[in-house]
């Protein structure tokens, strides 16, 4: 896994450079990356576990060739709404009553050599290089915290005069058993 109970992270992360830093807020330029993502219907809580399980099965060998793929961080999650391309970490984003969850694939893989998923609900795609605003926080990765930190990042972007071009998405870097105050969580928003 990517972290011990005490918080030591060992998982690879997507490459990026920091363009601007202001306390917990950053603007980053991410390299292009490949993600495995799935879209699920339901609440944040219910789709978090289901999405993670689907994607974990894929990287643990439920793919053509039964190849194991190293776990990376973060896990990305976002709500499905408008058609907005997704970026880095394990990410989760909301889409109406649907949530997207994605694992970033290790950098050594390409679309050509990455094992194909057996599960038809898992989509493999390349995410182009992009500029992303982020805010880092610790604690529980709850829907309430995601909404709170998304609002803070949106407000910071407005004060900076930076235009957001995506919905907020969450990025979690640690397994669920990590002590909450040691967890690394982030909110990401694509920007111009």
Features from the language model and the residues they span:
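A solvent-exposed interaction/effector surface
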Residues: 1-192
């Amino acid at each position: 896994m990517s972290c011990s109970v005490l918080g030591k992270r060992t998982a690879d992360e997507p490459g990026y450079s920091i363009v601007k830093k202001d306390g917990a807020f950053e603007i980053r330029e991410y390299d292009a990356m490949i993600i495995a993502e799935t879209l699920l219907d339901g609440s944040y809580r219910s789709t978090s576990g289901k999405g993670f399980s689907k994607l974990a099965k894929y990287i643990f060998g439920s793919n053509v060739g039964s190849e194991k793929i190293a776990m990376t961080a973060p896990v990305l999650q976002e709500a499905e709404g408008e058609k907005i391309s997704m970026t880095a970490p394990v990410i989760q984003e909301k889409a109406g009553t649907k949530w997207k969850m994605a694992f970033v694939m290790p950098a050594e893989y390409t679309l050509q050599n990455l094992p194909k998923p057996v599960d038809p609900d898992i989509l493999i795609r390349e995410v182009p290089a992009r500029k992303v605003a982020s805010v880092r926080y610790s604690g529980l990765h709850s829907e309430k915290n995601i909404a709170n930190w998304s609002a803070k990042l949106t407000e910071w972007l407005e004060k900076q005069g930076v235009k957001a071009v995506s919905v907020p998405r969450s990025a979690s870097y640690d397994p669920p058993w990590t002590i909450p105050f040691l967890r690394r969580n982030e909110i990401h928003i694509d920007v111009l």
